[in-house]
């Protein structure tokens, strides 16, 4: 039974209301510093911890709760007579409910003007110590680190005579240990990122010790293949616009491959400005098989589907605008695993109501960029900054005698944006705001060029006057010859080959325009 509670919080969301309800249930309130003042100013009877222990706060508040009368009351096992006898001998009442959240260390070090002394002063000592004590003794003590749990605890107390069940206490305790682990991890990340002069400005993006925090969203029936087990975890620092922020409106549970492909589709489609045009991306095995722009979602989908209607079967489709009824009716004619959009109209949802296996994911558009990209290798982890660079037309360098026309420049920019999301080696033919042929994942660039050309022919699409993007430089002129023979009149590529002069000369020989980006988009 909860008779006495200690409340000491940095995040004061809902704390007054929670304390008022505790008081109404007859719970004695202990508190510290600003929390105690807030409760007292709100008319609640509260005892300062310094008065409770008979020992004043000291060292500028560094020592407040580090006292046997606090930790003894938290850690004592109520089922052990010797523990309870020790409390009685030293006149220590039990503390049955602990509500603590910690100094805002992560918010502090995120500030550009943060200094090492600022960071050090925001390392909480007393808070984690109390939290760990209470979580260790969760059989007898209820511990809250998240204001979202206030209502649950109050509900159980009201229903059970001020008692909280073991299952709830256990869940809250595991939440505490996860929270303190993340807190210590953030401190380690920060301290091991500092340069020799320990200045915030000299911080390395890659700390000596890297701690990451993820919460499990779901376990899956299997992984990439049926013999593999799998689960999906959400980054606790997921940025705006990230796939992990999805809300599933309908459909079966997402599989491992669904999520991997959905991420590829969403990252590609949100790279297009929704204010400029509707975009549709169709993904198969993490590669775009059709990408297009249109005046609306339906037009964008129709054009994207035409690129490769065979590969689109059972694919993942993403839009950067609301999916309306017209587009929904067109998509519903095909077999699709997952549909993603910033929103779905009521009429569009009604179209798919009869297709409950289709997964509808709603994700708000956002411009957040992940801090890191990861790739697991045997015994280690490769960490890099995301490939977030979008080349602007003003950055392009025309290296041929012929310059691209305005239409060709638009097609080149579109092709380059798509190529970034195609597995290397990538060759992408585009024209009129749509992909015409995609060659992906080949060991030689010339083979990717041939495949892209063949895909366009199979789809009945002409490549005459098309634009081509290559995610990396042409090592020889052979790849360029293939795309020109297929009908391309302009090419965009990074440049940087020792044979750039030979490739540029070949472009001039063919009379096409070529621009260099100076940026490569390898994708493995």
Curated annotation (Swiss-Prot):
<feature type="domain" description="MGS-like">
    <location>
        <begin position="1"/>
        <end position="145"/>
    </location>
</feature>
<dbReference type="Pfam" id="PF02142">
    <property type="entry name" value="MGS"/>
</dbReference>
<dbReference type="GO" id="GO:0005829">
    <property type="term" value="C:cytosol"/>
</dbReference>
<dbReference type="InterPro" id="IPR036914">
    <property type="entry name" value="MGS-like_dom_sf"/>
</dbReference>
<protein>
    <recommendedName>
        <fullName>Bifunctional purine biosynthesis protein PurH</fullName>
        <ecNumber>2.1.2.3</ecNumber>
        <ecNumber>3.5.4.10</ecNumber>
    </recommendedName>
</protein>
<dbReference type="InterPro" id="IPR024051">
    <property type="entry name" value="AICAR_Tfase_dup_dom_sf"/>
</dbReference>
<dbReference type="GO" id="GO:0004643">
    <property type="term" value="F:phosphoribosylaminoimidazolecarboxamide formyltransferase activity"/>
</dbReference>
<dbReference type="InterPro" id="IPR002695">
    <property type="entry name" value="PurH-like"/>
</dbReference>
<dbReference type="InterPro" id="IPR011607">
    <property type="entry name" value="MGS-like_dom"/>
</dbReference>
<dbReference type="GO" id="GO:0006189">
    <property type="term" value="P:'de novo' IMP biosynthetic process"/>
</dbReference>
<keyword id="KW-0511">Multifunctional enzyme</keyword>
<dbReference type="GO" id="GO:0003937">
    <property type="term" value="F:IMP cyclohydrolase activity"/>
</dbReference>
<keyword id="KW-0378">Hydrolase</keyword>
<keyword id="KW-0808">Transferase</keyword>
<comment type="pathway">
    <text>Purine metabolism; IMP biosynthesis via de novo pathway; 5-formamido-1-(5-phospho-D-ribosyl)imidazole-4-carboxamide from 5-amino-1-(5-phospho-D-ribosyl)imidazole-4-carboxamide (10-formyl THF route): step 1/1.</text>
</comment>
<dbReference type="Pfam" id="PF01808">
    <property type="entry name" value="AICARFT_IMPCHas"/>
</dbReference>
<dbReference type="InterPro" id="IPR016193">
    <property type="entry name" value="Cytidine_deaminase-like"/>
</dbReference>
<keyword id="KW-0658">Purine biosynthesis</keyword>
<comment type="pathway">
    <text>Purine metabolism; IMP biosynthesis via de novo pathway; IMP from 5-formamido-1-(5-phospho-D-ribosyl)imidazole-4-carboxamide: step 1/1.</text>
</comment>
<comment type="similarity">
    <text>Belongs to the PurH family.</text>
</comment>
């Amino acid at each position: 039974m909860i008779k006495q509670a200690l409340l000491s919080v940095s995040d004061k969301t809902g704390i007054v209301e929670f304390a008022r309800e505790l008081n109404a249930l007859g719970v004695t309130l202990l508190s510290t510093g600003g929390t105690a003042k807030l409760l007292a100013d709100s008319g609640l009877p509260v005892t300062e911890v310094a008065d409770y222990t008979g020992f004043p706060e000291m060292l500028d508040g560094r020592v407040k709760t580090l006292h046997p009368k606090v930790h003894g009351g938290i850690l004592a096992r109520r089922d052990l007579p010797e523990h309870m006898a020790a409390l009685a001998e030293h006149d220590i009442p039990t503390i049955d409910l602990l509500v603590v959240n910690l100094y805002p260390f992560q918010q502090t070090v995120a500030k550009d003007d943060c200094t090492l002394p600022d960071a050090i002063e925001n390392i909480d000592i007393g808070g984690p110590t109390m939290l760990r004590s209470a979580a260790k003794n969760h059989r007898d003590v209820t511990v809250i680190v998240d204001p979202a749990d206030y209502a649950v605890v109050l509900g159980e107390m009201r229903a059970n005579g001020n008692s909280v069940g073991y299952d709830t206490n256990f869940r809250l305790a595991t939440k505490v240990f996860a929270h303190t682990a993340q807190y210590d991890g953030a401190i380690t990340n920060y301290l091991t990122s500092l340069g020799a002069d320990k200045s915030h400005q000299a911080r390395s993006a890659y700390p000596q010790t890297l701690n990451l925090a993820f919460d499990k969203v779901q376990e899956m029936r299997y992984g990439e293949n049926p013999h593999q087990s799998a689960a999906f975890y959400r980054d606790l620092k997921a940025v705006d616009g990230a796939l992990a922020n999805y809300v599933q409106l309908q459909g079966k549970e997402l599989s491992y491959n669904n999520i991997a492909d959905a991420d590829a589709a969403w990252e590609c489609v949100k790279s297009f400005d929704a204010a400029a045009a509707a975009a549709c991306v169709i993904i198969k095995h993490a590669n775009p098989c059709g990408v297009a722009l249109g005046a609306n979602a339906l037009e964008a989908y129709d054009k994207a589907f035409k690129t490769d209607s065979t590969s689109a079967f059972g694919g993942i489709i993403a839009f950067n605008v609301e999916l309306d009824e017209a587009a929904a009716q067109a998509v519903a004619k095909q077999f699709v695993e997952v549909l993603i959009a910033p929103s779905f109209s009521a009429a569009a949802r009604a179209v798919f109501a009869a297709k409950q296996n289709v997964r509808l994911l709603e994700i708000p558009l956002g411009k957040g960029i992940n801090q890191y990209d990861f790739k697991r290798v045997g015994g280690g982890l490769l960490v890099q900054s995301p490939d977030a660079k979008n080349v602007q037309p003003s950055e392009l360098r025309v290296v041929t005698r012929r310059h691209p026309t305005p239409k060709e420049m638009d097609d080149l920019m579109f092709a380059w944006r798509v190529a970034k999301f195609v597995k290397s080696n990538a060759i992408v033919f585009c024209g009129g705001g749509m992909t015409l042929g995609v060659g992906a994942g080949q060991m030689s660039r010339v083979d990717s060029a041939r495949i892209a050309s063949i895909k366009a022919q199979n789809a009945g699409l002409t490549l005459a006057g098309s634009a081509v993007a290559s995610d990396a430089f042409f090592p020889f002129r052979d790849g360029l010859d293939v795309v020109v023979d297929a009908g391309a009149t302009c090419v965009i590529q990074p440049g940087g080959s020792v044979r750039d002069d030979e490739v540029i000369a070949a472009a001039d020989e063919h009379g096409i325009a070529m621009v260099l980006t100076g940026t490569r988009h390898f994708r493995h």
